Amino acid sequence: MARSTLSKPLKNKVNPRGPLIPLILLMLRGVSTASPGSSPHQVYNITWEVTNGDRETVWATSGNHPLWTWWPDLTPDLCMLAHHGPSYWGLEYQSPFSSPPGPPCCSGGSSPGCSRDCEEPLTSLTPRCNTAWNRLKLDQTTHKSNEGFYVCPGPHRPRESKSCGGPDSFYCAYWGCETTGRAYWKPSSSWDFITVNNNLTSDQAVQVCKDNKWCNPLVIRFTDAGRRVTSWTTGHYWGLRLYVSGQDPGLTFGIRLRYQNLGPRVPIGPNPVLADQQPLSKPKPVKSPSVTKPPSGTPLSPTQLPPAGTENRLLNLVDGAYQALNLTSPDKTQECWLCLVAGPPYYEGVAVLGTYSNHTSAPANCSVASQHKLTLSEVTGQGLCIGAVPKTHQALCNTTQTSSRGSYYLVAPTGTMWACSTGLTPCISTTILNLTTDYCVLVELWPRVTYHSPSYVYGLFERSNRHKREPVSLTLALLLGGLTMGGIAAGIGTGTTALMATQQFQQLQAAVQDDLREVEKSISNLEKSLTSLSEVVLQNRRGLDLLFLKEGGLCAALKEECCFYADHTGLVRDSMAKLRERLNQRQKLFESTQGWFEGLFNRSPWFTTLISTIMGPLIVLLMILLFGPCILNRLVQFVKDRISVVQALVLTQQYHQLKPIEYEP
């Protein structure tokens, strides 16, 4: 049926051969995020999937990125979305990821092996996907200026758009429901999650169609609204309809996100609180180096050593600390005591300057899963900072850099890590830094090993009544801090520049990394043990209540008060929230009872500083104005009196007293 191309037809897009059945979709839209203890910079294997109307995956793309930072262009073919779709597409029996059906079409007439002439025009037939000729005509239809396609959102649309229908009408029951597509009126929306358009021009798709391939690729791009949504793991769905004469054919498709950990940790065996509790291994005798070379052509396969026990790991930390200290300061290791601190914090960080490496793809060490966030409670020095560093931590920054735009991975140099507000990590994602208020400082990790002189240790064993002063404990971070990066430039000429290549320093770094991994495992084991213990206790409680059911339960039989298990983590969290609420209420009550003059000082901190600054000069000026005239008058009167006295003295000096004349009788 002919129609004008200058206006949209006001037609009902519901299938006239079947009534519109109301469909109520109950969807649980949860926010899918990583585990609460994971770092936001952790890299996952992310897969974006495009599904057909039966929720089958027909196209997918994968990559290694942090969650909610990778928004690629999705390029499925239009005919891929029609697999197991309505019969007029011709692919109702076609399985996903199968080859395009039908023989190719030929130019200049039919020939053996060809279905029909590619140049044969499309008459009254609806574009289909079952042959190369049909796919070519479908491409021509979607690229025409007066035809094309439009897309309508599914259940995630606003409530006022409920009249747009369900999957039976491809969510496009009436005009105005479309939010994107390729049509002459250019449908658009400010709230929908995606935009859809053709990925190839018509000229490019012609040859692809003639070669009997999928030749109607789409390009689906995420909008700003879609990038803010974190419920992609449950999937979102749309309907697509062709804008042609008569009834517009259509289909439904969806987009969902799947992610998995690149390095899952699967526990095998028992679940002790402290993992790998093994006795201390006996020291092996030192072997002299052999000059015998292995035969050429036979590579030596490295043997994987079993994981070290707790005692071995602690001893390796002290041994590595001694080797590093002996290499840099041999005079301090002539006679000394190195003590490993048994209480937290077990590690301290030293901020350093260094040159990190920039990667466009996630390196292997960025994909290591971390079930818990490890934080540093003590960081000293000044080093390299990245991100929006708050004023409370700017003292740790010698140089502050802003994160570059784009998706990059900043890997810390060897022997260092990034201490971020979200925890320790070997590499950081610039996308996460740009999306959040996270900041990171480049630090060296040093175990809490204290250095004591022999006099201090001997004094502990001496029985003396004298009270000695508290000794100053030097930690390994104070003695060797900044040696990985900053100490290299400072150690030129002293031999410390070669420390990075020595086996001693590598031994210390390896011991630190092993111990950090075991600390994380211990935290996980403690968490699992507490959960298991609570389950056992609650199960035993239920069993005892059933046994003493006739007596009224366990508490009635024991004649004691009933005790219940409480998750103190949640209680503490709720208590802190209530405490903050009460403090806010008291603060508001206190402010409401204050006068305007008192409140002026509280609301304007700068006003208090201004008053305290100018109050002194103002008081002095006021005193001068009040008592200045009186003091000035007194001073003038005093000067006048002194001048009068001086004038009198001058006048008296010009005259002398005459002697009296005596007359003789």
UniProtKB/Swiss-Prot annotation:
Lipidated residue numbers (S-palmitoyl cysteine): 630
Annotated transmembrane regions: 611-631
PTM note: Specific enzymatic cleavages in vivo yield mature proteins. Envelope glycoproteins are synthesized as an inactive precursor that is N-glycosylated and processed likely by host cell furin or by a furin-like protease in the Golgi to yield the mature SU and TM proteins. The cleavage site between SU and TM requires the minimal sequence [KR]-X-[KR]-R. The R-peptide is released from the C-terminus of the cytoplasmic tail of the TM protein upon particle formation as a result of proteolytic cleavage by the viral protease. Cleavage of this peptide is required for TM to become fusogenic. The CXXC motif is highly conserved across a broad range of retroviral envelope proteins. It is thought to participate in the formation of a labile disulfide bond possibly with the CX6CC motif present in the transmembrane protein. Isomerization of the intersubunit disulfide bond to an SU intrachain disulfide bond is thought to occur upon receptor recognition in order to allow membrane fusion.
Motif residue range(s): YXXL motif: 655-658
Gene name tied to this protein: env
The protein's name in its UniProt record: Envelope glycoprotein
Sections of the chain in a coiled coil: 500-537
Extracellular side: 34-610
Originating species: Moloney murine leukemia virus (isolate Shinnick)
Motif CX6CC in this chain: 555-563
Intervals, Cytoplasmic compartment: 632-665
Signal sequence extent: 1-33
Renumbered residue ranges of the record's region Immunosuppression: 538-554
CC terms in the record's Gene Ontology section: host cell plasma membrane; membrane; viral envelope; virion membrane
Keyword terms, alphabetized: Cleavage on pair of basic residues, Coiled coil, Disulfide bond, Fusion of virus membrane with host cell membrane, Fusion of virus membrane with host membrane, Glycoprotein, Host cell membrane, Host membrane, Host-virus interaction, Lipoprotein, Membrane, Metal-binding, Palmitate, Signal, Transmembrane, Transmembrane helix, Viral attachment to host cell, Viral envelope protein, Viral penetration into host cytoplasm, Virion, Virus entry into host cell, Zinc
Region called Fusion peptide, residue ranges: 472-492
Annotated segments matching region Receptor-binding domain (RBD): 34-267
Sequence ranges of Low complexity compositional bias: 281-299
Site description Cleavage, residues in chain: 469-470, 649-650
Keyword DNA-binding in annotation: no
Role of this protein: The surface protein (SU) attaches the virus to the host cell by binding to its receptor. Interaction with HECT ubiquitin ligases activates a thiol in a CXXC motif of the C-terminal domain, where the other Cys residue participates in the formation of the intersubunit disulfide. The activated thiol will attack the disulfide and cause its isomerization into a disulfide isomer within the motif. This leads to SU displacement and TM refolding, and is thought to activate its fusogenic potential by unmasking its fusion peptide. Fusion occurs at the host cell plasma membrane. The transmembrane protein (TM) acts as a class I viral fusion protein. Under the current model, the protein has at least 3 conformational states: pre-fusion native state, pre-hairpin intermediate state, and post-fusion hairpin state. During viral and target cell membrane fusion, the coiled coil regions (heptad repeats) assume a trimer-of-hairpins structure, positioning the fusion peptide in close proximity to the C-terminal region of the ectodomain. The formation of this structure appears to drive apposition and subsequent fusion of viral and target cell membranes.
Segments carrying motif CXXC: 336-339
Single biological process term from Gene Ontology: virion attachment to host cell
Glycosylation sites: 45, 199, 326, 358, 365, 398, 434
Gene3D superfamilies referenced in this protein's UniProt entry, alphabetically: 1.10.287.210, ENV polyprotein, receptor-binding domain (3.90.310.10)
Assembly and oligomerization: The mature envelope protein (Env) consists of a trimer of SU-TM heterodimers attached by a labile interchain disulfide bond. The activated Env consists of SU monomers and TM trimers.
Renumbered residue ranges of the record's region Disordered: 268-309
GO MF terms, alphabetically ordered: identical protein binding; metal ion binding
